[in-house]
Amino acid sequence: MASRSAGTLLTEFNAAYVPPGLMPGYKGHVPGVAFSFGSPYGTTTLKYFQDQRNAALGRSSTAFSRGGHFPTIFSLNPTQVLRNRALTRDRWLHTPSYTRFNLDSSRWAELLHFYQMAQRHREHYQDKTGLVHRVPYFVLPVKEWDRYPIPTDLPPLSPKEKWHLLRVAPENLRTYQTFPSGKRVSPQERQRRDCYFEFRA
């Protein structure tokens, strides 16, 4: 028989008693929890869960199925001991990704530099504006004669082009200065005159 002191009282009115299995919206049963019309099933189960969770957080030594799982150094439960976890399932999570002695630092620096160049090349490849410069490392090589053609392999020059090249040659350029009076001054005289006037100033 349900009694108030035992905590198993389901309702205060026997005439209005409805079995929990026939109540609309009933989703289950929590044993050991007093259920009544004043406290809906959702509120009761939420309070039961919060109480169990707070108790588990306070102890920090129960299994996860009972509301909390906190690994410790010393515990009565062997699945929570840090040493046991490190030897079983969590050994791959804490695997070091570094080496104690770096014996090939130059190779590591080379790989890091190559990775940075690859990222810059990726940015250049994805660029649509043409503002990102290309990385020379990833430019495909071409034949030497395509980049630096031999002069004998070029087509012959026309007389007009030959005359133009001879006219702009350094030995054919005018290096003298012509004054309005018609007098021409050589570069050597101009150099001496400039030194004199610079010294006088």
Swiss-Prot record:
Location in or out of the cell: Cytoplasm, Cytoskeleton, Cilium axoneme; Cytoplasm, Cytoskeleton, Flagellum axoneme
One Pfam family hit: CMI2B-like
Cellular-component GO terms for this entry: axonemal A tubule inner sheath; axonemal microtubule; sperm flagellum
Quaternary assembly: Microtubule inner protein component of sperm flagellar doublet microtubules.
Family: Belongs to the CIMIP2 family.
Record has Cytoplasm as a keyword: yes
General function of this protein: Microtubule inner protein (MIP) part of the dynein-decorated doublet microtubules (DMTs) in cilia axoneme, which is required for motile cilia beating. Binds to the intra-tubulin interfaces.
GO BP annotation list: flagellated sperm motility
Organism expressing this protein natively: Bos taurus (Bovine)
Keywords from the UniProt entry: Cell projection, Cilium, Cytoplasm, Cytoskeleton, Flagellum
Name recorded for this polypeptide: Ciliary microtubule inner protein 2C
InterPro entries in UniProt: CIMIP2C (IPR052329), CMI2A-C-like_dom (IPR018902)
Gene: CIMIP2C
Keyword flag Cytoplasm: yes
